[in-house]
Amino acid sequence: MKKKGLFFSFLLFIVCSFNLLAENFPQKASKVEDFIPKGWKSVVVKKGDLNKDKIDDVVLVIQKDDAKNFEKSEDNTIFNYNPMAILVLFKNKNSQYNLVAKNENGFIVSKDKALVEELETLSSPDLDDDLSKSINIKNDTLRLLTRSEYVKGARVTEYIFRYQNNKFELIGLEYKYWHTSSDYAVDIAYSINFSTKKLIGTKDISGVRTDETKIEKVEKNIDVKDKYILDTMAQDTGIKILEKYDN
């Protein structure tokens, strides 16, 4: 009986710890700024209609601003490891904002954390510091562009979400990867459409020192059973999707 009591006490401690780590965001507010918790800052505010009511909604990217999450390297470079979150706010005809989606699961991390750990981070298609370009609202869809840098390569992924079934569901994924070794240069591109349940891809392998080139193409139907939601996307979700359907 005592062991059972200790177990439930430990479980309660874990639950409380997670609640302390999570931020409390309001469900409704009259200003976008009201959704930014104390100790956090705005990184991107992107406006556009996401629910076909002809009223501009808001995609808000925020980042914690805690000195404890800054680290100095041996060459005195300062790295910012502060966590980031994505919020989607629907604006109604009364100019009130409603929180309809949020992700604070590490789906998007800071540029410095991504650089050090080879993770995905929001990226401008022009490779500049304007992160507002990494978010695009087009044809009632929300598109997030991310990039991962490697020693001799990179990975670029565009996630396409649509608001349906009262949530932002992933309806498409565009993936590009390139890598160069001492012998080969590899270019891979995949396009997955979860609405039509199709995958189209190409893999181009070229010799660095030779004229040897090998191109593989794939186009197939996929059995889509899982739904991927913006709120529950994680850092490795994109890779897991590719591993699941590219087989």
Please give the residue ranges for each predicted region.
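Bacterial N-terminal signal peptides
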Residues: S9-N19
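N-terminal targeting signals for Sec/Tat export/insertion, comprising classic cleavable signal peptides
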Residues: S30-D57
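Acidic/hydrophobic-patterned starts of short beta strands in beta-sheet-rich repeat architectures
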Residues: L50-I62, N136-T146
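Acidic, small-residue rich beta-repeat scaffolds with periodic aromatic anchors
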Residues: E120-N247
